[in-house]
């Protein structure tokens, strides 16, 4: 009996655990602290700093089943999903890793044992082919002489991409840095399927399928292209779970494995589809996986960056549901079946099921309102098309007006063999993107440029002043030996009391000083294991090796500590008041305010905000001790410690507890007791995205300042109303009632004046071919009274045509009224359009009543004078 996908995943992890590997949980789909990646797209992403030597783990062997998304940027599989056997937006990458431990021999032997042993995957050995890099004789000999694969099934692959080391069998992280050859294992499905072995002209067929890539990181590529051997070579491997499941379950398409068969049946059930071979079912089954897990990892639909990619995938799925005939919202209903089919890998998703479903439902409902109209517009444009390419401006209009991502438009066009001018679309988008860009802040983006080999020891939990030594200096991202007064730089110390930005808490400010220099620190950031002090040398000079005194801005740090501790209290209070579905989606803690983004599907009610505020202040009055303990990550989770969104944790973690009220994993700086916070005030609650709310709050002196400001405003209002704060509400109600009464009386007076004006005007009507024509410019009449006056005049004059105008604040207001017995000859809409055109405006309406506006008041007399001639011509 073949293994299920869940059993295959577990067997892989169990095998490598038996070989001394630490089983490491999948990291978030949002890469930690890596701006070069849109989404996690490989198993090695979470170990990148380990391979670069910037991070260390307490294990040298690891194995994972890593959730990955490829739907944006360089790795974008979106347009092929559903149309091929193996493309997905979401997939799981099985991997084993060696950090300077074993190398080629063991990596190859492990792979062969897992794939061919009767105890494990038991694949027929004769079905397996391998490739090696052309010059990697070591790997070739291991496969041939130790494993015993015949030479005809070992293929050397050279530089097949037009440059040295540019090969399918040579992996590199970038233009410089760790790199090395790789060996790939292929499975031969048999000669009943078209295709040739790797390296042959028919290699793109489906007969020979790559199932495992084993990368040997053995070189450090220099800027000049030279390859220096690494002192401790490493191994990074990746095997797509869906691909190996297809092989082990004896099917040729990933969409035929048990996991997808179950999901496709669920899609058919919620959409009403009956043809299980329909490609739209595949699209939706794939897309629910990426969408659900992205939302669970904190990504929300939006029009920027990761949120926009998520929105594109959701909307593509909704459109395919529409094609299948879905009559109501359906996509969110697939989260439950997905959790069931993912087994143990779906536990994180299950905890957030309600939140994920709500976000998907809201997004689908919003898009459904414009989908039909957008598709109709696209149909119209395609019907008019003379060539085979839809212009970029139309694609942009569909995006801008109807929320159609360009790839959804391309999807529709693809079904009709029409291309989309994506370059034209990008040009139309550029102005919007430019407006959306944010200023980068202080100086350059040092974090993207600086690579520090040294490590810094943080001692800021216990010290705000400390002596240290300069271990590195950077100017404009380049290492230098010394800096002089006036230069901006990043200073790295061997030890420091300065906290580097992390976990939502901003970096410290302060001063680095010595007998002959002073360096003003404006920010503190992490660079791998080093801590960089970003700022400007105010006086003197500073060089690598100098001793410095590092002084943190104590008052600022104190305010940050209060705000950070209050954030923990508020998080716990929100979960008590709103429910345990609340989880952190982002935070900012600085010296002025705390900002907290959390999952919740509706605006908080005033009484809920008050309840959270009261609960936090109650904990402050309890003056609970704030304690930290270092423990294993699993022990911390067992204790109920909440993890911060987007943070990466080591196996040993810092657990912060506030009595029995709050327990979280946190590396930030905090107050000693909750009583130190003094006072907590929420100053705003708002929405930031579908299913995400934001609270801003203040503490301590900041909270007291808001109390004083509120009191001052109340005193000012009381003074204006000649009352006091005790009876202020009654005073305001009284003033509002009096205002309403006066407004009512004023309106009555205006109506009386308009009626009188109408009576006076009726005598000025002239006869034009048996119809009474009245044209007049009025002064001192509100534009909204014109309609009432026209109705009165029509009643008085009988068979009539009326044009009234008034000017207020330089703007012209026009109205035309035509009695119904005349509308067959004169239509109010045409008449008002003729007049409005002359005063720089436009308007329209019914045949018997029409209104317009204009901007050229000076042209009004001539425009009104033209009415008589126009009407006379119509009445002849």
UniProtKB/Swiss-Prot annotation:
Principal subcellular localization: cytoplasm
Residue numbers binding Zn(2+): 564, 568, 666, 670
Cofactor: Zn(2+)
EC number(s) on file: 6.1.1.7
Domain notes: Consists of three domains; the N-terminal catalytic domain, the editing domain and the C-terminal C-Ala domain. The editing domain removes incorrectly charged amino acids, while the C-Ala domain, along with tRNA(Ala), serves as a bridge to cooperatively bring together the editing and aminoacylation centers thus stimulating deacylation of misacylated tRNAs.
Protein family (similarity comment): Belongs to the class-II aminoacyl-tRNA synthetase family.
Quaternary structure annotation from Swiss-Prot or TrEMBL: Homotetramer.
Protein name: Alanine--tRNA ligase
Organism annotation: Escherichia coli (strain SMS-3-5 / SECEC)
Gene: alaS
